[in-house]
């Protein structure tokens, strides 16, 4: 099986056909023409200043509340390193992004996973944990089209989560890189925009709406916290990548970002629908929540299918998936995360057929 023949539902990245390469070329040319000195210099740890101001305007905050970083994972790392010490309690969703688990565990944090359902994190379960004595430093939440579950946190639960954070004294880390990629329903307000108690730090990225290669993300939060992180960033790398950030800035101010979001959302909406239909047709025992946006669909397979056994069989049949157990401290043995962002529509049904064939072989 060659790389060209492999159908991969593994990587959460857009396929090249939905990346606005020409728009990026034009943005790069404008950036070099407009501000050659600014974009080729070291810059400051808060990021490329015009982009910082644009992000502040997008979120309705002061520029002092924004730091631009080398991708959202860098933003995550800055916040985790600033807030979490060995032994500190941290709440995350169950399931959650695998690198979140890894990074928090590497810091020595005591990670508590709280059940996630079709409406997001179970706030009643979280309240029970808090009332039992848990005092976390932060709760890491992916509110829109969550990675890996694909679900969206309901408006009611967003309100409750904000109330719990204020009542029990923890920060909400609203990790929101997928928010703009909605292809069904109406958008919900961010918890950042709803916050009246300074309990939210918001992160996002241009990886999903522009392209992964730009490596531009950001944090928005209380000015004092952002200033403290910026000082640490100065010692770490002086400044993030000014060239990438200047290109992203031109991509945004020209309106290309809006066209890119529309293109990506339309393409991924079609892929998500085709994937859901294919699963219903070829794996009738599977259950899942069809996402309203984002990159991912989480599938619970029948209990007689162990994904540790399925994974190598699927690989031999030319389809790559990610095991649900990668996103959990325990469990996930019968679940898969399927990323539909990098597969084209004409690959999806064949990919699901291969998964179904692998399931049949595991059962045989």
Where are these regions (language model features)?
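Conserved core of the PLP fold type I
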Residues: 38-168, 180-197, 268, 346, ...
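Conserved glycine-rich beta-strand-loop-beta hairpin in the small C-terminal domain of fold type I
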Residues: 249, 266-276, 287-300, 313
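PLP-dependent enzyme catalytic core of the Aspartate aminotransferase-like
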Residues: 316-317, 329-364
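Active-site PLP attachment segment
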Residues: 192-228, 240-243
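Short hydrophobic/aromatic beta-strand micro-patches
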Residues: 220, 298-300, 339-341
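Structural signature of PLP-dependent enzymes
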Residues: 40, 229-234, 254-276
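Glycine-centered flexible beta-alpha turn that most often forms the glycine-rich phosphate-binding loop
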Residues: 175
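N-terminal "arm"/small-domain region of PLP-dependent enzymes with the aminotransferase-like
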Residues: 1-45, 57, 170, 316-319, ...
């Amino acid at each position: 099986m060659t790389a060209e023949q492999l159908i991969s539902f593994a990587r959460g990245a857009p396929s090249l056909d939905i990346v606005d390469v020409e728009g990026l070329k034009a943005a790069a040319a404008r950036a070099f023409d407009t501000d050659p000195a600014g974009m080729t210099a070291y810059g400051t740890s808060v990021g490329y200043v015009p982009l910082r101001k644009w992000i502040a305007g997008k979120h309705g905050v002061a520029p002092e509340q924004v730091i631009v970083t080398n991708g959202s994972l860098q933003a995550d790392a800055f916040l985790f390193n600033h807030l979490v010490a060995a032994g500190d309690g941290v709440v995350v969703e169950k399931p959650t992004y695998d690198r979140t688990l890894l990074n928090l565990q590497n810091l020595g944090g005591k990670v508590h996973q709280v059940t996630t359902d079709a409406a997001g994190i179970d706030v009643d379960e979280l309240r029970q944990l808090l009332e039992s004595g848990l005092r976390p430093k932060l709760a890491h939440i992916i509110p829109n089209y969550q990675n890996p579950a694909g679900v969206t946190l309901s408006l009611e639960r967003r309100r409750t989560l904000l109330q719990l954070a204020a009542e029990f004294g923890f920060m909400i880390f609203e990790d929101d890189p997928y928010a703009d990629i909605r292809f069904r329903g109406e958008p919900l307000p961010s918890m950042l925009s709803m916050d009246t108690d300074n309990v939210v730090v918001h992160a996002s990225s241009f990886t999903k709406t522009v392209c992964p290669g730009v490596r531009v993300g950001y944090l928005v939060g209380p000015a004092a916290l952002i200033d403290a992180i910026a000082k640490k960033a100065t010692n770490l790398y002086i400044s993030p990548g000014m060239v990438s950030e200047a290109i992203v800035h031109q991509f945004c101010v020209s309106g290309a970002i809006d066209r890119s979001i529309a293109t990506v959302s339309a393409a991924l909406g079609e892929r998500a629908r085709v994937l859901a239909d294919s699963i219903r047709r070829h794996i009738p025992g599977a259950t899942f929540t069809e996402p309203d946006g984002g990159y991912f669909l989480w599938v619970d397979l029948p209990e007689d299918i162990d994904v540790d056994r399925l994974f190598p069989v699927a690989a031999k049949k030319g389809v790559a998936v990610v095991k649900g157990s990668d996103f959990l401290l325990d469990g996930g043995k019968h679940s898969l995360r399927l990323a539909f962002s990098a597969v084209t529509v004409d690959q999806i049904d064949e990919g699901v057929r291969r998964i179904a064939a692998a399931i049949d072989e595991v059962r045989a």
